[in-house]
Amino acid sequence: MVRVKQKNLESYRSNGTYPPTWRNPTTSFAPDQHRVSIHSSLKSKTKRRRLYKEADDNTKLRSSSSTTTTTTTMLLRISGNNLRPLRPQFLALRSSWLSTSPEQSTQPQMPPRVPNLIGGSFVESQSSSFIDVINPATQEVVSKVPLTTNEEFKAAVSAAKQAFPLWRNTPITTRQRVMLKFQELIRKNMDKLAMNITTEQGKTLKDSHGDIFRGLEVVEHACGMATLQMGEYLPNVSNGVDTYSIREPLGVCAGICPFNFPAMIPLWMFPVAVTCGNTFILKPSEKDPGASVILAELAMEAGLPDGVLNIVHGTNDTVNAICDDEDIRAVSFVGSNTAGMHIYARAAAKGKRIQSNMGAKNHGLVLPDANIDATLNALLAAGFGAAGQRCMALSTVVFVGDAKSWEDKLVERAKALKVTCGSEPDADLGPVISKQAKERICRLIQSGVDDGAKLLLDGRDIVVPGYEKGNFIGPTILSGVTPDMECYKEEIFGPVLVCMQANSFDEAISIINKNKYGNGAAIFTSSGAAARKFQMDIEAGQIGINVPIPVPLPFFSFTGNKASFAGDLNFYGKAGVDFFTQIKTVTQQWKDIPTSVSLAMPTSQKQ
């Protein structure tokens, strides 16, 4: 048996990256060694268990060392293959743009391998297949993410399953304290998280901070879970009979994340799930997994017990394994319609609870009485922010009446936006995520031109000095678009604003409602009556009135509908708590022992 102390991961967090893995192993395992016992450092364990001792009923979450060793050994037992623990060493960062340190190593470095998190330990995958994580502004390889093996996936699910009984019985006040500490650690490490997101995903540093902050709000909301998870009680429903309902955790839950919000979407998922008492399997996007790994380490430092949160990486096979595994009770997904409907159908066929948030075509309706400057700024920010890679991006604008004066002003202001690497201080928008994404966006722009739309502003051929290899597309505006065009029917997911014209308010509402998507819609007007009509008549699930991106704060729920959502319960808010819990109803009666037995159906009528 090989004992490896797990390194405190402050070194990687200080540089905005994830923990380095065992790149050049000097220790090999003998063929008959099929078990690896991984012990966290005593310092880390002490921090993580300090909170458990504070439970109101003095519940002890710390198991004996022998029990911990036995359990972890069992979780990591894989016949013929060992889960390789991280070697306790810090590897110099490969590129200057990833580090906050002023000095960089001149030694050539191989990209680090992103670890899985299984049973409280970061372990290197034994997979033979890895995917490059690429900086979209430079095309440099940041790291390599594994296609997790089936044995490793099963070990992660087993760890979550075995952690569940103790975690669900942990006082809810203790679980809340973990979240309180977690939100504090996120705030302290926000700059490093933002740098990692900008490096891997491409969005500007300011936008990366927004990504983290919107997720942080969900963590803060989860700190009040004792109130959110309350049940209902009604005394004397019959003679001497009381009935109450309680909300209990489901068990092992899973989350499958997209590339466009590397911090926010994971924070929509696992903080709510684990604070309800569940354990969790997180699959980050293979394009930008670093933020999820950093967040997981912060969660463990905050006191989350081993096995409560696990991370597995991969693509289709990992997703299918999540859908098929009988021990996983619920799956939360954000991503494309193709993937979302596949996951919904496959997981639902296995009896799982599903929430699947998918594609969008969000419309902004502009009435002639709208405030000109405020509306133009809103359209630019919502259409081109994050290079248009938001599920709530305002990608389509419908002008009622004259459109030309609005379009001319839009073009003028869009030309002033700075397109460059997201880490540059003056960047307004960065690159799109990949070369394939850029090619698809450019194809849809050209399809609009071919179908008769007018290209008012073309950002396809932009070249950014110093970042010539980047996946950059400048702000692009198409005018005269009609509902039958592919550029309108498809979600472009890039910095492209599609402009349409309607002769009347009612016609504009009809155009919006005929679109298959229903994530969000916004109106820009000075008329309260028009705003109220819009609110009542529009079928989209989230409405903005002079608000371009109406994403609700977490005490409400994210409520996309139509083709933008599949499932019965939405993300966060009350619906999110309901999704990660199940209702148990208890009917009780305390009275003297009866002298006779009645076989009649019980009713509320006095017998």
UniProtKB/Swiss-Prot annotation:
Q: Does the keyword Mitochondrion apply?
A: yes
Residues binding NAD(+): F259, K283, E286, K287, S336, E491
Organelle targeting sequence:
1-98
UniProt xrefs under CDD domains: ALDH_F6_MMSDH
- Listed GO MF terms: copper ion binding; methylmalonate-semialdehyde dehydrogenase (acylating, NAD) activity
> Where is composition skewed (Polar residues) in this entry?
9-30
Check the record and name the InterPro entries matching this protein. Ald_DH/histidinol_DH, Ald_DH_C, Ald_DH_CS_CYS, Ald_DH_N, Aldehyde_DH_dom, MeMal-semiAld_DH
Q: Which domain of life is it from?
A: Eukaryota
Which reaction is this enzyme known to catalyze?
A: 2-methyl-3-oxopropanoate + NAD(+) + CoA + H2O = propanoyl-CoA + hydrogencarbonate + NADH + H(+)
Its annotated compartments are: Mitochondrion
Query: What EC number(s) does this enzyme carry?
Result: 1.2.1.27
The record's listing under NCBIfam families reads: MMSDH
Q: What is this protein called?
A: Methylmalonate-semialdehyde dehydrogenase [acylating], mitochondrial
